[in-house]
Amino acid sequence: MVAEEFTIGNIRRAVTGIARYIVSQHPEGARVVIGRDPRYMGERFVELAAEILTGFGVRPLIINDPAPTPAISYELVRLKADGGINFTASHNPPEYNGIKFSTPDGAPALPEVTKAIEALVPEDGSASPNANKVGIQSETVDPKPAYLARLKEIIDLSLIRRSGIKVVFDPFWGAARNYSDDLLRDAGIPVTTVHNTRDVLFGGHAPEPDGELLDECRAAMKKAGARIGIATDGDADRFGIVDQDGTFIQPNYVLAILFDYLVETRGWKNGVAKSVATTNMINALAKHYKIELHETPVGFKYIGELIKQDKLVIGGEESAGLTIRHHVPEKDGVLAGLLCCEAVARRNKTLQQQLRDLFGKVGSFYPQRDNFRLTDEVKAKFTKKLTSDPKEISGYKVKSVVRTDGMKLVFDDGSWVCYRLSGTEPVVRVYSEAASEDGVKKLAKAAEEWIFN
């Protein structure tokens, strides 16, 4: 939280650790892209990071305006920079901020990199090296033109235009303002934008495109007669999709629809990746298409590694992050929304119709996610449970136990539950999935009982 953990002193410490790491990897000289989302004091944090980097002989490539995380990622790859620093708290409330470090390939830093950086973070953040002690000058860069040009290569904008569909875009006052809508508008596609001004408070709530927070997007869709609403979070790495009738399409289903769509239209069949907590509809589609499935721990960095190795058609998580082949190894909410527009335009079907088609193809899947706060006593007991091998929970017979991340219990009927303890608060996240709405509600209740009994 800003002014608590996220202070000028701690920023100095973190960026100093990054600078030391960069210099250790590139002693002959290096360049680092620095970007941010629209949060309060972001400009000052970028200036501070640039000052520290120059003190270590590293040239800062500064993005002046707020920019989407995937655009920053694409820019550092395009410029062949040696890393990227992004000041963002993504979809978290406005009082939070954070520092994200990306490696030269545009991917989120893997654990071995973050551990190396942590080891180089100084105890004291009161001072930093003298700025420009070696005459290093910063440089200003603009990621928007090249990033939008790349999206034009990926998305069939002429198809969307010819279909005549209208689109509503909601950037949630975030970093994607004037990105998705500018791209669509320049291609001659009717688009209405809401929440398109800078607001460091994001309307007074977390910039997370979900549920009731999309009501103004829905209202704009109804007024404009739009076929689809696309939204992005604070730094535009996550997406929110609203169907023609105002129904929110949960990210699990968006990932499945786009996986099916890309195999059908691009002909790619080189693999698919999903986190352990993401719908098994992806497993079923992979089996249907005879495509290799990669199930990863939660955290997009693992999917990013597979994208870099060209092993995937698409990779994604239930938390609304995805990317595709030949694109950045980073979550891209802008790309996700535009691909949904293309799928609706080409197939001339709503996303719910496309989902029903998938149910007919591979069976029905109903995912659910719940969070439960734990007392110290309950957490201690439950942590021990996570190391056990239960044969059944509340009458559900366990077929297998998966420990890729947390504990995932797969049952005889194909339904499953995954438990993951939060690393920052006394909360357990519970992911459940069954073949019917009623079934997943009952399963989720049984999963809850197993925690507290």
Features from the language model and the residues they span:
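An N-terminal, well-structured beta->alpha segment
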Residues: 1-51, 55-56, 136-167
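N-terminal small/polar loop signature for handling phosphorylated ligands or for N-terminal nucleophile
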Residues: 20, 28-97, 182-242
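Proline/glycine-rich low-complexity loops and linkers
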Residues: 64, 119-149, 244-316, 323-324
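Gly/Ser/Thr-enriched, mixed-charge loops and adjacent short helices
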Residues: 97-224
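Gly/Ser/Thr-rich active-site loops/lids in small-molecule metabolic enzymes
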Residues: 110, 193-195, 247-266, 333-341
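Phosphate-binding and adjacent anionic-ligand microenvironments
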Residues: 227-228, 268-453
